[in-house]
Amino acid sequence: SNIPDGEAHVMPDGKVYIYGSLDTKEDSWCSNQYKVISSADLEHWVESEISFSIKDVPWADEIQEPTYLEGVKSYNELPEAILTFLPEETREMPIDQFLPLLRNILIEQQKNKSLFAPDCIYKDGKYYLYFCLSDDTEGVAVSDSPTGPFKNAVKLPVKGIDPAVFVDDDGQAYYY
């Protein structure tokens, strides 16, 4: 498997575990599931079964209205992420005609959400997998094992991609 965007952690059993996106197709990145790879010696690696799936995300079927399009009066006001992928010839269409088309595309894309790069920590006897979806929602799921399965996903009150977490020497956990 191809697991890009990896976050490596030494867990209490002394093994290194890598958590990352899971590319399952050659023509696209990310997918709707995660696997974990681990090693006791950094030479021999073991790939887990599916550790987490988008099917375990209660809000995965929700459609987020692209509210950031409200009030846009010109192409220059669109988010940079959209402008990057927007063909130059598209800008010839009047913005008031283009925005409804863009909204429909953005809504349609949400029907095929992906899981982006996760991270995982061990704290108080449990493993916490912090994950994000392609719609910028984020969550956390828990397991008794560093390779999952991670369950009981809870939505976090933040938006973004590729969360990172760590536990400091004093036991305080940080999420960023």
Indicate where each model-derived feature is located.
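Carbohydrate-active catalytic/glycan-binding domains of CAZyme proteins
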Residues: 1-176
